[in-house]
Curated annotation (Swiss-Prot):
Species this protein is from: Mycena epipterygia (Yellow-stemmed mycena)
Residues spanning the signal sequence: 1-21
UniProt-recorded name of the protein: Dye-decolorizing peroxidase
Transmembrane feature ranges: none
Annotated catalytic residues: D231 (proton acceptor)
Annotated thermal dependence: Thermostable. Retains 50%-90% of its activity after heating for 2 hours at 60 degrees Celsius, while no decrease in activity is observed within the same time at 30 or 40 degrees Celsius.
Gene this protein is translated from: dyp1
């Protein structure tokens, strides 16, 4: 918590105006000798109007349960707002030198949540660091921080989460990655300058293992992933950080993401140095965009009054659960509504058990006409399909970013991917199984989820689900089918659509721990 006893004493002696100006900040963050940096004039964030806004530092300060954002690394709470971001994976070759430089030179470079929330305090390049389990062990840190999946590493769980290990990039195979630097800025030039500085500081104490450059897509596609859909709308509101909860946004305890905070299921057993850190799941997910587009073009939904192109757009929207604008199909079932999609006060405000077009005879446990049970956003956030006590423990904060170039003309013409592109997936959680692993293995890749529906084989998530790479059936994608040559239509919500292949393929990743600044200091001193 950020408020000290002295803060509350001040309440009785200062006016409100004086208090806002003079409130002391209680933090566990260690002192840092920062070299003065040039001031920014533009934010390093993108800010699509459809996405929730970040709070100001002043707004966080006013919260009764405010988090210690001076001590929390900047990437954990901000979500999917980076313009450009580099993931630099490394191994530690000389632990003693690395820890010495970590304390003296790297710690002052680490960007806090406080710094990232204002353009005036953002560095030219934001820097975060996280360590794998083998990385912590290599640095002499052997404490049990309460996560068996973190200890096992992602490679050992590849088949558990539906991956095919033969398709993994060799860099992620095994446990040789010890850590990752996350560098975010407006330009790759600024990122490369900061990376060169870090490499100069650490010298031969580290070895580069892998790197992946991510970037927001250009122009009107900013904020959209490579299939074209606006991403990042359904982030949870974090108590102690989020000052304005939007309609439909779920407020949850910070301990779902930050170790040792309220709501952390292992709050009492975490070592003190791990408090306010978070487990970072990284995944390199290739997206086969030309093939996805061709599939939609080949299988347009045959809906009265709709062209084939519109039918293809509807199929894609029903697979995702949102139109490309971000408008949810549950609220706009048959056509896109860009105004709705851009309105953060409406685009997330719905519940699957409340009909968008109210009908007393409609019970959405048995009706997927408006939104398929297996749609991507319903699989990962089944609002109303489950009780809050069943769903809320599995929230994650996504901090992903696209990577790779736009689809080339040659790829579009041939409907064949020739250039690697996709999503650098990042999620933060305080328990890897409750977060990423549960979502991927129990919900996304489970043909029977959402449980309790009439259809016993709903299918895997049509976007990121997998059954070993082969074809899989998804029910509910086509709500109407023609019944005769006069093109009469009837409801058939259980009609299966066969998806011939995976359009998203994992090439591996790793589990990391992103410590607080005080945690980084403790690791350096271990």
């Amino acid at each position: 918590m950020r408020k000290s006893i002295s803060t509350f004493i001040l309440l009785s002696v200062l006016s409100v105006g004086q208090l806002v100006a003079a409130r002391p900040r209680s933090t566990n963050a260690p002192p840092r000798r920062r070299t003065p940096q040039p001031r920014r004039t533009t934010s390093l964030f993108i800010n699509p109007p459809a996405l929730p806004d970040l709070p100001t530092v002043q707004a966080v300060d006013k919260l009764d349960d405010a988090l210690d954002i001076d001590n929390i690394q900047s990437d954990i709470l901000v979500g999917m707002k980076k313009t450009k971001e580099l993931f630099f994976f490394f191994g530690v070759e000389d632990a003693a030198t690395f820890k010495s430089k970590l304390a003296s030179d790297i710690l002052p470079l680490i960007t806090t949540t406080t710094e990232i929330l204002s353009t005036d305090t953002q560095p030219i390049t934001a820097v975060n660091i996280a360590f794998s389990h083998t990385g912590l062990v290599a640095l002499g840190v052997n404490d049990d921080i309460g996560d068996t999946d973190f200890v096992s590493g992602q490679f050992s769980e590849a088949t558990t989460v539906g991956d095919r290990p033969t398709l993994w990039d060799p860099a992620f195979a095994g446990t040789k990655i010890h850590g990752v630097f996350l560098l975010a800025s407006n330009t790759t030039e600024d990122i490369n300058t900061e990376l060169a500085n870090i490499q100069s500081i650490l010298g031969s104490s580290i070895t580069e293992i892998h790197r992946l450059q991510g970037a927001a897509r250009p122009g009107a596609e900013e904020g959209h992933e490579h299939f074209g859909f606006l991403d990042g709308i359904s982030q949870p509101a974090v108590n102690g950080f989020t000052d304005t909860v939007l309609p439909g946004q779920t407020p949850v305890d910070p301990g779902l993401f930050l170790l040792g905070e309220s709501g952390d299921p292992s709050q009492d057993s975490r070592p003190s140095w791990a408090v306010d850190g978070s487990f970072l799941v990284f995944r390199q997910l290739q997206q086969f965009v030309p093939e996805f587009n061709q599939f939609l073009a080949d299988h347009p939904l045959d809906i009265p009054g709709r062209t084939a192109e519109e039918g293809s757009e509807l199929l894609g929207a029903r697979m995702v659960g949102r139109w490309k604008s971000g408008a949810p199909v549950f609220l706009s079932p048959t056509q896109d509504d860009p105004v709705l999609g851009a309105d953060k006060n409406r685009n997330n405000d719905f519940n699957y058990l409340v009909a968008s077009d109210p009908d007393p005879g409609t019970e959405n446990h048995f009706n997927q006409t408006a939104c398929p049970f297996g749609a991507h956003i319903r699989k990962v956030h089944p609002r109303g399909d489950l009780s809050p006590s069943a769903e809320n423990p599995h929230f994650i904060i996504r901090s992903s970013i696209p990577y790779g170039p736009e689809v080339t003309d040659a790829e579009a013409a041939s409907s064949t991917t020739s250039v690697d592109r996709g999503l650098a997936f990042v999620s933060y959680q305080s328990n890897i199984f409750n977060g990423f692993v549960f979502l991927q293995s129990i919900w996304i890749n489970n043909v029977n989820f959402i449980f309790g529906k009439v259809d016993p084989t709903i299918g895997v998530d049509p976007i990121i689900g997998t059954l070993g790479g082969g074809p899989h059936n998804i029910s509910g994608l086509n709500p109407l089918i023609p019944v005769n040559e006069t093109v009469d239509f009837q409801d058939d919500p259980w009609n299966d659509v066969v998806i011939p292949r995976d359009f998203v393929v994992s090439h591996g990743g790793e589990y990391f721990f992103s410590p607080s600044l005080s945690g980084i200091s403790a690791i350096a001193a271990a």
